[in-house]
Design a protein with these regions (language model features):
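VWA/integrin I-like adhesion module and closely mimicked acidic/polar interface patches used
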Residues: 67-68, 102-145
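Disulfide-rich extracellular ectodomains of metazoan secreted and cell-surface proteins
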Residues: 39-40, 53-55, 63, 123, ...
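Short coil/turn segments at secondary-structure boundaries
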Residues: 20-22, 58-60, 110-111, 141-142, ...
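Von Willebrand factor
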Residues: 2-58, 93-99, 133
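Surface-exposed acidic, glycine-flexible loop patches that form ligand/cofactor-binding
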Residues: 33-39, 80-90, 117-120
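Loop/turn elements at helix/coil->beta-strand transitions in domains of secreted/extracellular proteins
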Residues: 39-43, 90-93, 120-127, 148-151
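Phosphate/oxyanion-binding active-site loops and adjacent basic polyanion-contact surfaces
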Residues: 19-24, 65-75, 108
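Von Willebrand factor A/integrin I-like adhesion domains
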Residues: 133-171
């Protein structure tokens, strides 16, 4: 049976204070709950980023501080993908969800290009959940990450994730 890897990358900087931070925590809990009751084999990897990247747990309170350094999150994601490739021999398909506040620091391009060399990332489904208004450099990051504007969303529901997982497993 195929394993579906779900990589949830989120902004944990000062930009998520208030409503955006609450929505990120809520989304992480919903995604975790949806995957707990999924009949398919799934793995959830939650990566937060600010000045440094870190792993988060599904029902953990997220402190908002630091700068939104997306390159740090991409480095951590690259490390996780490399580790998974070394130790996972089963066929896997991946969904990447990037939850952003709408601000990204410069320096992400090199890390994103490295990720596109990774087969799992290049052929995975990539979505962005965006809050706030994005400036020009952030819009470029959003479009380069997803490659299609239809995958830049304002909300990502449990139902959408469950149907994606089902389509991946059956397809």
């Amino acid at each position: 049976m195929k394993t579906v890897n779900i990589y949830y990358i989120f902004d944990a900087s000062v930009k998520i204070r208030g409503n955006a931070g609450h929505r990120i925590e809520e989304n992480i809990s919903r995604i975790s709950r949806a995957l707990d009751f999924s009949p398919y084999k799934t793995k959830l990897h939650i990566i937060g980023y600010r000045d440094r990247a870190f792993f988060a747990k599904p029902h953990e309170r997220i402190g908002a501080y630091g700068n939104p350094d997306f390159a740090e999150g991409l480095k951590m994601l690259g490390n996780v993908l490399d580790y998974g490739r070394k130790y996972e021999h089963a066929k896997a398909r991946s969904v990447f969800i990037w939850h952003t506040s709408g601000t990204v620091l410069e320096g992400w391009k090199k890390e994103l290009e490295k990720l596109y060399k990774n087969r799992e990332f290049a052929f995975g489904l990539r979505y962005v959940v965006q809050h706030g208004v994005a400036d020009r450099s952030t819009k470029e990051a959003l479009y380069r990450f997803t490659e299609t504007p239809e995958r830049i969303l304002h909300h990502f529901s449990e139902g959408r994730l469950c149907s994606l997982v089902e389509n991946i497993v059956r397809g």
